[in-house]
From Swiss-Prot:
Component of the COP9 signalosome (CSN) complex that acts as an regulator of the ubiquitin (Ubl) conjugation pathway by mediating the deneddylation of the cullin subunit of SCF-type E3 ubiquitin-protein ligase complexes. The CSN complex seems to link protein degradation to sexual development. Required for fruit body formation. The keyword Transit peptide does not apply. Residues 249-430 form the PCI domain. It is found in: Cytoplasm; Nucleus. This is COP9 signalosome complex subunit 1. PANTHER family: 26S PROTESOME SUBUNIT 6 (PTHR14145), COP9 SIGNALOSOME COMPLEX SUBUNIT 1 (PTHR14145:SF2). Belongs to the CSN1 family. Component of the COP9 signalosome (CSN) complex. GO terms for biological process: cleistothecium development.
């Protein structure tokens, strides 16, 4: 397995995932069909066999995402290329999107030119194009009639049918426009919610993450019955999490996926499944939360636990991380790397997420130590055969170079002694810092107690304290601080001697 990703850091890895006005993964759709071409983006080649079974995996999805996922697997996986592309061709022929059928046939011809499916079915193409043109003309003619009659409900339904037609044939730009035109003719909250979800689905397929987020906010802000809002919440949170994942906002994405209600079930399978929520949310949380947050907000979360039960290896990885068992955690993630590299939404974030999780693991491992041998670290963080770990303390080894890189960019506050083969922490003495904080707190406590006693004695004596001028008050406060700091200095000196 050889991920063909740029090595210029997270910025380069995520640069093609910044929110776009249109297109998917930073690629503009075809102006005629609205299709997103992936040929311009560097593909991640996956040589290893994934753990999932293709038919069972794709059966969890509905709608256009089935083809998109099959096509991605077929063009990225050496092991599943032929089977996935054959399934993608069959999926395309079950619909009316001629352009995606031609793409799938071309992709199969590149890897297996002798397969029967690698030849274009010209009759089907011609027949489908005629059907699509006739259907488009009919729907547009009906919509013009509705507009002439000025019946709002008919106009809304006409735009909806036209948008669904454009979406089915892959003209995502026209589908987006048709759904957007429904806005002025929606008369009930349920109509508005239905329209916004259709726009969100098209925006997700286009990779238009700004539009996904803006329409999610509209869904959240619109009124409606409490039961309707509760029904929409899971899909809203999942869509928002997906847009934040693609934007590289992993902590926000984790929060959104964790907030997704388990009632999501299979209601959003045209975009993602409950298993996807568990994987996306778990990986984003591992990459962005500390151990306390992971334990409290993920493992102890009774709601998100329902998702984690669908992907128990994610739950185990998080548990191992929280218990400082970093090697088993990293081994689990590495075992599922091929699966995640074949996921349409996760693929180009896998390297960034894995790097962050690994860096966090190294940081957490070093916290209790002032000095640790490189060999003992290699036993935990160098995955693979144990026989290869003995040479990992060498200055030219990949592991030592990784540590040097983390030290140079300020991630690790440490230095490496290559002569003794140890990593030495340069952090300050935590005990002295705690002692200083306690003594400062004691100073504040003594001063506060003195002021309270003084006020109590003044009131008991029946004296009246008139407001002081600003200058005199400042001088008295400074004099009081000097007197009370002497107590703190004495305690500090005594404490240091002890």
């Amino acid at each position: 397995m050889e991920p063909m990703l740029p090595e210029a850091g997270e910025a380069a890895l995520l640069s093609s995932y910044a929110p776009q006005a249109s297109g998917s993964m930073g690629v503009d759709p075809d102006p005629i069909t609205g299709l997103v071409s992936t040929s311009a983006a560097p593909l991640v080649r996956v040589e290893e066999a994934p753990k999932f079974e293709l038919e069972s995996y794709i059966a969890n999805y509905t709608g256009r995402t089935r083809f998109n996922r099959l096509y991605l697997i077929g063009t990225c996986s050496s092991y599943l290329a032929v089977d996935a592309l054959k399934a993608a061709i069959a999926e395309a022929k079950s619909g009316k999107d001629v352009a995606r059928y031609l793409r799938a046939v071309q992709a199969l011809a590149d890897v297996a030119p002798n397969e029967p499916e690698a030849t274009i079915d010209s009759d089907w193409v011609e027949r489908s194009q005629k059907v699509v043109k006739a259907e488009t003309d009919r729907l547009e003619h009906e919509l013009r009639g509705y507009k002439n009659n000025l019946i709002k409900e008919s106009i809304r339904m006409g735009n909806e049918e036209l948008g669904q037609h454009y979406h089915r044939i892959g003209d995502l730009t026209s589908a987006f426009k048709a759904y957007s035109r429904m806005r002025d003719f929606c008369t009930t909250p349920s109509h508005i919610a239905s329209m916004l979800f259709k726009i969100i689905n098209v925006a997700i397929e286009r990779g238009d993450w700004l539009n996904v987020q803006s329409n999610v906010h509209r869904l959240r802000s619109q009124g409606g019955k409490p039961e309707e809002q509760a029904k929409h919440q899971p899909k809203i949170s999942a869509a928002m999490g997906l847009s934040q994942l693609h934007s590289g906002s992993y902590l926000e994405a984790a929060n959104s996926f964790i907030a997704t209600d388990p009632s999501l079930g299979d209601t959003f399978n045209e975009v993602l499944t409950s298993n996807d929520v568990a994987v996306y949310g778990g990986l984003c949380a591992l990459a962005s939360m500390d151990r306390n947050e992971l334990q409290r907000r993920v493992l102890d979360n009774s709601s998100f636990r329902n998702f984690l039960e669908l992907e128990p290896h994610i739950r185990r990885a998080i548990s191992f991380f929280c218990n400082s068992k970093f090697r088993p955690c990293l081994e689990i993630l590495e075992a599922y790397r091929a699966d995640y590299l074949l996921d349409i939404h996760l693929q180009r974030h896998v390297q960034v997420l894995y790097n962050r999780i690994r860096t966090k693991s190294i940081q957490q491992y070093l916290i209790p130590f002032n000095r640790v041998s490189l060999e003992s670290m290699a036993k935990i963080f160098v995955l693979g055969n144990p026989t290869s770990q003995s040479s990992q303390s060498d200055s030219k080894s990949a592991f030592v170079q990784e540590l040097i890189s983390l030290i140079q960019d300020g991630t690790l506050d440490a230095r490496i002694d290559l002569e003794k083969h140890v990593l030495v922490s340069t952090q300050g003495d935590k005990r002295i810092e705690v002692q200083e904080a306690v003594l400062d707190s004691l100073d504040n406590y003594v001063r506060e107690a003195h002021l309270r006693l003084l006020r109590s004695n003044i009131i008991r004596a029946g004296l009246e304290v008139r407001p002081l001028g600003e200058d005199r008050r400042t001088k008295l406060e400074e004099r009081g601080k000097k007197g009370h700091s002497a107590i703190g200095n004495l305690l500090r000196a005594t404490g240091m001697k002890q």
